[in-house]
Regions:
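Active-site-proximal alpha-helix that buttresses catalytic centers in soluble enzyme cores
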Residues: 1-264
Length: 264
């Protein structure tokens, strides 16, 4: 962000899906908020949540930073004299959640002199090798010399998201000696596809599961780590040794720095 933009009463609105798990929020969205306030002290930095369920669940009184809806923050920033608005839509990929945010911002363009909306980290414009390099460092931290398989566990897939992941996975596999699989909780290939392939292979494996989710919170705990019905539970029942990384991607400084590098 240039000094010229700063003098034009700029504002940065961070929008995340949010988590009702306050610790998960503190580890990602609240860090975005604090770090951007420090990086751009002349800008009005605000944050909002896009998920109605999160807003219903979260205790606003206990939150570390202000908890607001997107309309609330747009009205506030307009009232505070922001003319040039930059929206950091903090999403990993172009999912429904991302386009919901875009749909809420677009009608408000006339309220500001300029409005920019960030793309998700995984998109068709940026070099897939860049995000593969960042993820490779994270996988190296999660795996060890005994790891037989690294499973990247994402939440939701559609045709566009699956295509965007392909060159990233190709690069990751070139750089990693351990086989890597990407699966989705909602989408294909899913948990059952992984279990079927492992059954066909017919041997017990030492598996490391790394969540491809920005927040650690509810989905990680329930879908990947719960004692019953989770990916970890199903793999263990099939005879495999399983380690699940406890971090959401947004907890890694390199991921947050990639957001900043690409968008400011």
């Amino acid at each position: 962000m240039s000094a010229e933009t700063q003098t034009r009463r700029s504002g940065i609105l961070i929008i995340t899906h949010g988590s009702s798990d306050l610790a998960a929020d503190l580890a990602f969205s609240d860090l975005l908020f604090a770090e951007l306030k420090e990086k751009y002290p002349e800008a009005l930095v605000c944050q909002a949540y896009s998920a109605p369920k999160t807003l219903q669940r979260i205790d606003r009184e206990r939150a570390q930073t202000p908890v607001n809806t997107i309309p609330e923050m747009l009205e506030y920033m307009k009232a505070e004299g922001v003319t040039d608005l930059y929206v950091l839509a903090a999403n990993l990929n172009p999912c429904k959640k991302y386009f919901r945010v875009v749909g809420m911002i677009e009608p408000c363009r006339s309220s500001f002199r300029s409005v920019r909306i960030s793309p998700p980290l995984l998109n068709s414009e940026d070099d897939p090798a860049e995000i593969a390099g960042v993820l490779g460092g994270i996988l190296g931290e999660a795996a060890n010399s005994n790891t037989d398989l690294i499973v990247l566990a994402a939440h939701t897939a559609n045709e566009e998201i699956t295509e965007l992941w392909k060159p990233v996975l190709d690069q990751l596999q070139k750089d990693c000696a351990v086989p890597i699989r990407l699966i989705f909780h909602n989408g294909k290939p899913g948990f059952s596809d992984l279990l079927s392939d492992l059954c066909t292979a017919g041997k017990s494996q030492n598996i490391v599961v790394v969540p491809m989710m920005l927040f650690g919170g509810r989905h990680l705990q329930k879908d990947l780590m719960a004692e019953e019905g989770s990916l970890s539970a199903m793999l263990k029942e099939a005879g495999h040794t399983v380690t699940v990384s406890l971090k959401g991607l947004g907890e890694y400084p390199v991921i947050r720095e990639l957001f900043y590098k690409r968008n400011f």
